[in-house]
Structure formats: C-alpha cells, structure tokens
C-alpha cells in the first residue's frame, strides 16, 4: 500500500499511475479475499434508539453508560433497543465485544414481537452458522421468508442469496434477481452489490456492464468494500467504461 502511495504521489520516485495501480491491486485482492471469507452478507449500520443519524456517528465508541441504558430498555421490552444491541453484539465494534450468544438472545426477543429486522438477522445467523447456532438452511429460509413477507430488505436480500447459491432451495437465478432488486430498490447495499454481480456475470439477466457499474456505484456510496474493488477493476480494465488508471486508483 505504501509503495502504491509513493508512485501515485511521486514520493521519492517518478509519478506512475500504472505502477501505483499494480501495488494497490495486490492490496485490494487481499482485502477482497478477507471480506469474502468474513461472511456472505454485509452488516447493516447499527442504529440504537435516539442515536443521531449522521453517517459519521457509526465510527465512534459507545459510552458504557449508554450501553447499560439500552440494555435497560431492551430488558423492559423496547424492540428497537433489542435489535440495535443484537446488531452490536453480532458484529462487534464501537467498543462492544462480539458476542453471538447475546446477539441471538436479543434478536429472538425482538423477532417474537414480529420485528422483521430481527427475523432477517436470525436468518443471517443460521445461514452462516457459528459457535452459537448450527448452520441450517431450512431455519435461515424460514426467517428470511418471514422478514421478506413483511417487506424487509435484509430478508429479501437473504432470500436472493439462497436462490443464487441453491441453499435450501433449488438454484434459481431469476428469483435471486427478483429478491435482490426488491432489496436494492429499498437502498439495501447488499442487494445493490449482488445485482451488480449478476449484471456483470450475466446470471439470470442479460450481461450488462453499464448496469453493473450503476449498482456497484450505488453500493460503493454506502461504503461496501467489494463494490469499490469491483468498480476499480472495471475502470482498470476498461470493462463497460473507458479505461482509466486514475479513476481505478482513486476508487
């Protein structure tokens, strides 16, 4: 990464976009592999009750007193607090340790009240499996379907993944595309990314690089790492767009 930076800005070497791109590609491929190993879907931004909606707020640590307050609300039956804490413990970060056991408990409480987001996250947990729940396509399908029936974008995207990969259901690219489109139309980043992939590969739809770029761009605006990687690759190779080394590096 440092070498790429040096060639891009001409630090102690002659400025060379192509050389910078070579180094950045190596790093990007490692990141892409790590993200793919980390799970099939992205995690929705955690929103706790009364939290400010500014995009940067998700980067900060959460005060212990605030966590205790949300735990108090969750214990009193506040569904939004239960879902928010479930997400925090599911993914970890912001000063909160990853704890899938607690995440499962909070999601289950909220799902039992009919909360679609909690149902969708239970679907994620069973689709991926782990130390707390055994992987179960049938259980994942049940929760994703319950969430999707309520119009939940995370549930719709989850169903899309199951049909895309034939997990618990016959592989069906047309149905996968349908559910990803429903999710993407609600602004859900994983639906946007998967639509980009389907247009890029021509799965369930005619190959269309312009549409792939459109959906990768939408997903990148929400910060999806794989969307940035795919966009950079397309600009670097001139796939569906005029080749631009500068744009590839900047992305």
What does each of the following model-derived ranges do?
Residues 1-6, 21, 209, 220, ...:
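Catalytic cores of eukaryotic secretory-pathway lumenal/extracellular enzymes that build
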Residues 14-23, 59-65, 96-106, 133-143, ...:
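Structural signature of tandem alpha-helical TPR/SEL1-like repeats
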Residues 27, 71-73, 109-110, 146-147, ...:
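Canonical positions in the second alpha-helix
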Residues 43-84, 89:
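Extended repeat-based solenoid scaffolds, especially LRR ectodomains
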């Amino acid at each position: 990464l440092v070498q790429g930076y040096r060639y891009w800005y001409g630090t102690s070497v002659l400025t060379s976009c192509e050389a910078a791109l070579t180094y950045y590609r190596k790093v990007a491929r490692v990141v892409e592999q790590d993200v793919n190993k980390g799970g099939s879907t992205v995690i929705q931004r955690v929103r706790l009750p009364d939290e400010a909606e500014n995009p940067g707020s998700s980067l900060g640590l959460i005060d212990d007193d605030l966590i205790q307050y949300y735990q108090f609300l969750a214990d009193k039956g506040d569904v939004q607090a239960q879902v928010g804490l479930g997400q925090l413990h599911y993914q970890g970060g912001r000063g909160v340790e990853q704890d899938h056991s607690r995440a499962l408990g909070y999601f289950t409480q909220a799902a039992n009240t009919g909360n679609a987001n909690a149902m969708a996250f239970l679907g994620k947990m069973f689709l991926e499996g782990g130390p707390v729940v055994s992987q179960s396509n049938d259980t994942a399908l049940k929760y994703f379907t319950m969430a999707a029936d309520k119009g939940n974008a995370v549930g719709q995207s989850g169903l899309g993944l199951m049909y895309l990969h034939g997990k618990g259901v016959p592989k069906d690219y047309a149905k996968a595309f349908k559910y990803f489109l429903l999710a993407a139309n609600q602004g859900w980043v994983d639906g946007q990314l998967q639509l980009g992939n389907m247009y890029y590969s021509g799965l369930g739809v005619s190959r269309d690089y312009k549409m792939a770029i459109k959906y990768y761009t939408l997903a990148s605006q929400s910060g999806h790492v794989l969307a940035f990687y795919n966009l950079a690759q397309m600009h670097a190779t001139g796939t569906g767009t005029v080749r631009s080394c500068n744009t590839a590096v900047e992305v």
